[in-house]
Amino acid sequence: MIEADRLVSADSSGFEEAADRAIRPKLLAEYVGQPQVRSQMEIFIQAAKLRGDALDHLLIFGPPGLGKTTLANIVANEMGVNLRTTSGPVLEKAGDLAAMLTNLEPHDVLFIDEIHRLSPVVEEVLYPAMEDYQLDIMIGEGPAARSIKIDLPPFTLIGATTRAGSLTSPLRDRFGIVQRLEFYQIPDLQHIVSRSARHMGLEMSDEGALEVARRSRGTPRIANRLLRRVRDFAEVRHDGTISADIAAQALDMLNVDAEGFDYMDRKLLLAVIDKFFGGPVGLDNLAAAIGEERETIEDVLEPYLIQQGFLQRTPRGRMATVRAWNHFGITPPEMP
């Protein structure tokens, strides 16, 4: 099973990137959710503009699909500067990064997605650039090699990662601002779905938006993907208007249940309940029972189930919680 193939995957495709770009908020005033992040960034941006300085370097981390790229775009728009975008895996050589840095205008924003995947060689170049706005470049080889310094304009580096723990301490410590994005509350997701529906020219009731929001796993990217599929259903099977009932019919047809679980989530939980009496069950046994790789279970399926309190990871193996039993209408066994 490939994670990107799942309707409830938080990873994005190229098509979705283009589609979502058109409906993303452009300014903090339009930004929904993450109230603490929004209020802090308002102050930091306003202070930098009052001083005429570049904004401090910003690290944004959190699960995929929560709007790290959106926030980077908003910062650049609020500061009134250009945004240059790249990603960790693309910057293979020190020269790749040097070329981007030397083309920046004063106060520009350089956004590096998946910054935890920077190579050590590239990361070394980044340290003096972030700290002193200077590039240290080696010219020549062997005994004739010499270091030259190139001054850079003041700029803001925004790094985004789903794995903050994978960043090296020297890199992490050079970010003056660190923001964690949390899963969205249902009312905020409902607002996002309604806003996206308006941008797409859809007629959608508040209850319809709420139904989509409830099944979106706290993730705007998933909410927008589900909205597009509900739109298809409404246009083909009905008159295009999306009510709560039509949204529920569409999502049920797509095998996305009331908790946002798809077929694979339910298959894993039911295997623990039915085949292993609720657990504990070892990861290898569970992988064999559902026909998946253990890495897929650990990295793709488990995290959301554990976060939502449906699965427990114990020293003796995986266990289904009472909430998981109740979700399927099965009476949990009496605790000894």
Swiss-Prot record:
Binding-site residues for Mg(2+), renumbered to this chain: T69
Reactions listed under catalytic activity: ATP + H2O = ADP + phosphate + H(+)
Primary site of residence: cytoplasm
InterPro entries tied to this protein: AAA+_ATPase, AAA_lid_4, DNA_helicase_Holl-junc_RuvB, P-loop_NTPase, RuvB-like_N, RuvB_C, WH-like_DNA-bd_sf, WH_DNA-bd_sf
Role, per record: The RuvA-RuvB-RuvC complex processes Holliday junction (HJ) DNA during genetic recombination and DNA repair, while the RuvA-RuvB complex plays an important role in the rescue of blocked DNA replication forks via replication fork reversal (RFR). RuvA specifically binds to HJ cruciform DNA, conferring on it an open structure. The RuvB hexamer acts as an ATP-dependent pump, pulling dsDNA into and through the RuvAB complex. RuvB forms 2 homohexamers on either side of HJ DNA bound by 1 or 2 RuvA tetramers; 4 subunits per hexamer contact DNA at a time.
Domain notes: Has 3 domains, the large (RuvB-L) and small ATPase (RuvB-S) domains and the C-terminal head (RuvB-H) domain. The head domain binds DNA, while the ATPase domains jointly bind ATP, ADP or are empty depending on the state of the subunit in the translocation cycle. During a single DNA translocation step the structure of each domain remains the same, but their relative positions change.
Protein name: Holliday junction branch migration complex subunit RuvB
